[in-house]
């Protein structure tokens, strides 16, 4: 029995050795012969297909060829406070943070002041107009989110502008529609444009909204629901006419003559409610007065107008600003980085030929209306509208499922091409 067991073990070992030798020969053949290697790969893949085969769960149809992704869906919807300053600094602050400040003033550089304070949504748009006839299209969600006491970031960090280019006006827009934007320039030109024409898809650089001559600059950009126009010149002339006198034309045009100038420049312009009674005039030497609007005759565009104050050759004055506005308005006087806030009702009423009353002994650098928080600077004064979806802010990416599917190969395709 022991002999038989030993003989059996020897036979098993010999059989195993022969099997190993055959396997070694087969492996060497596979490694040395590309055709044999490809044959083995095909056999293995067929086994995989047979073992794991199952019907496809997705279906590709010709009429369903793309997916459209609305990039605005990626923007968190949030109500924020937007601040714009005369020096071009911008920021957005969370509404919750702003509400907790109890009326504290925002941080500003010396001599800087706020020209726009708005309550907006991150899906809204901020339009910034410059003295060089360009506008910056800034989606609110791209503004830097900062604290109320932070200075903000200069707008050139968002859109590159020239060194001598300055932001003169900010408008908050939640809906681009048929409302009118009216532009006035230093050389006495004006034009009317439709808000809907300001929508752009690419906003990485300034966009022209009025064609200027070399020595001209934009004085003001206005969006008001009223119909009365009043323009004042630096040398003291004022002209009153109806807004319908100004034609509606394209963005890249120069406009028409707003007022007839003789060695003069436009100081300011306003669009006002016909029920307002007084024209407020402020000069660079700190003199001011209010004139009854009834002292002026409403006329037509492109005339010289009437004198707003008596000319004194020994003490010449230049008009800084002229307002026809609500008597309850507050204005800020800027001189040597100092500011002084006064009510229009504090300014005395005089006739057109008087020189005015002293409201400050300092020479004024600027005068501006005090900004109050508004939801949409260009909505009707009696109604605030808000749009949640904005077609102009959408960026769509298209992906063809059919093209992607055609790039994939089945195992059978692979085996047929495998050579």
What positions do the PLM features span?
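Short, structured "edge-of-domain" segments at secondary-structure transitions
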Residues: 1-419
């Amino acid at each position: 029995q022991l002999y038989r067991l030993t003989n059996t073990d020897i036979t098993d070992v010999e059989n195993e050795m022969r099997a190993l030798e055959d396997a070694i020969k087969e492996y060497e053949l596979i490694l040395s012969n590309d055709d044999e290697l490809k044959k083995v790969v095909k056999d293995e893949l067929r086994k995989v297909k047979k073992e794991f085969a199952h019907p496809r769960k997705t279906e590709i149809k010709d009429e369903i060829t793309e997916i459209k992704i609305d990039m605005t869906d990626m923007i968190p919807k949030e109500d924020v406070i937007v601040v714009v300053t005369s020096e071009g600094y911008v920021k957005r602050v969370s509404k919750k943070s702003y509400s907790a400040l109890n009326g504290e003033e925002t941080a500003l550089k010396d001599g800087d002041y706020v020209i726009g304070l708005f309550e907006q949504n991150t899906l809204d748009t901020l339009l910034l107009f410059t003295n060089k006839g360009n506008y910056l299209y800034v989606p609110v969600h791209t503004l830097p989110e900062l604290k109320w006491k932070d200075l903000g970031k200069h707008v050139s960090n968002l859109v590159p502008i020239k060194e001598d280019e300055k932001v003169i006006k900010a408008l908050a827009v939640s809906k681009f529609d048929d409302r009118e934007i009216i532009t006035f320039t230093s050389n006495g030109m004006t034009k009317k444009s439709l808000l809907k024409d300001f929508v752009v898809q690419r906003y990485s650089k300034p966009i022209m909204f009025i064609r200027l001559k070399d020595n001209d600059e934009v004085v003001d950009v206005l969006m008001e629901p009223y119909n009365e126009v009043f323009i004042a010149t630096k040398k003291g002339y004022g002209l009153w006419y109806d807004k319908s006198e100004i034609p509606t034309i394209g963005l890249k045009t120069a406009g028409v003559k707003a007022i007839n100038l003789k060695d003069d420049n436009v100081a300011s312009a306003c669009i006002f409610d016909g029920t307002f009674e007084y024209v407020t005039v402020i000069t660079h030497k700190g003199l001011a007065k209010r004139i009854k609007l009834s002292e002026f005759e409403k006329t037509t565009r492109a005339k010289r107008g009437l004198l707003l104050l008596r000319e004194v050759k020994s003490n010449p004055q230049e008009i800084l600003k002229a307002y026809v506005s609500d008597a309850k308005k507050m204005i800020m006087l800027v001189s040597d980085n100092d500011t002084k806030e006064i009510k229009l009702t504090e300014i005395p009423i005089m006739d057109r030929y008087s020189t005015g009353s002293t409201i400050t002994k300092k020479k004024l650098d600027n005068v501006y209306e005090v900004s109050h928080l508004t939801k949409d600077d260009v909505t009707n004064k009696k109604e605030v509208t808000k749009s949640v979806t904005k077609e102009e802010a959408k960026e769509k990416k298209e992906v063809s499922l059919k093209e992607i599917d055609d790039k994939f190969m089945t195992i059978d395709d692979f085996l047929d091409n495998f050579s």
